[in-house]
Amino acid sequence: MRLAKRHENLRPSGMVRMFQAIERMEGVLNLSIGEPDFDTEPDIIEAAAKAARDGFTHYPPLQGFYDVREAVCRYWERHHGLRSKPEEVYMAVGAMQVSHLAFGALLDPGDEVLLVEPCFPPYFSQVEGNGGVPVAVPTREESGFAPTVEDLRRAVTPRTRGLLLNSPCNPSGRVVPRAQLEEIAAFVQEHDLFVLSDEIYESLVFSGEHVCLATLPGMRERTLTMGGLSKSHCMTGWRLGYAIGPEEVMRTMTLISAVQTYGLNTLGQKAALYALDTQDAKLLERRAVFADRMAAVAERLNSMKGIR
């Protein structure tokens, strides 16, 4: 069967090839993927089971249940000061669907998107798959692997349409400081760009603060915030992501997804509703555990010759 020409050069990423290789190995400690080793809390699982017993076994609203989107709004206002309304939230099949739909909603053929490196490799394929052109923006150790305005100015062109910013970052772990984010925000407004702000690790900042980009002056109307419950609530297998952004973008993403997934599974959404409203103490407990582990690994690595 002949494949579409646009997919002829599509190849598994290095990360996918590595996962495929270790499937055949024994005794491998996989430190590569951002997945908590904690299981989902039993009361969250029970919330999903109760939803099934209560009859939430039919097609969901395409944008997501209204009460679940309200819970997303409450969570982000409570934790990060981002005020939004349910009409500005889209419930997705994981945060990866958010970025794919967002690029589909915002890019015209040939539009360029600045991708700050190091970054999550699938972003490049998502931009290309939606007709855009990914433009890598390298960062340096001396700037803490955070993008500077000078880095962005070297990469921007008249065809640049947007910026994808990931803070806290996968894979470097860097968190862009507030002052640097303010400079980036000014640059974005100067060039009239949209920002896809991947903040999926917002709950796992061990020192300093996480600043939600959309809360900065002038950024609310041009920022699409990506989030989800995979990292914060140990629910990677549930595939629960969401976007927060301008209503017109949420509507367009919803229309695109109508011919793809036709909504996010109902039981997962009801589990998310419960989790977002009840698990703040658990988030703090797990973050403390992860912080201890991080410190132990850093101490061990720093004691090794040739590793810095």
What are these regions (language model features)?
Residues 111, 132, 190-194, 219-221:
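A short helix->loop->beta-strand "cap" motif at the edges of active sites that frequently abuts
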Residues 25, 130, 190-191, 304:
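Helix C-cap/helix->beta junction micro-motif
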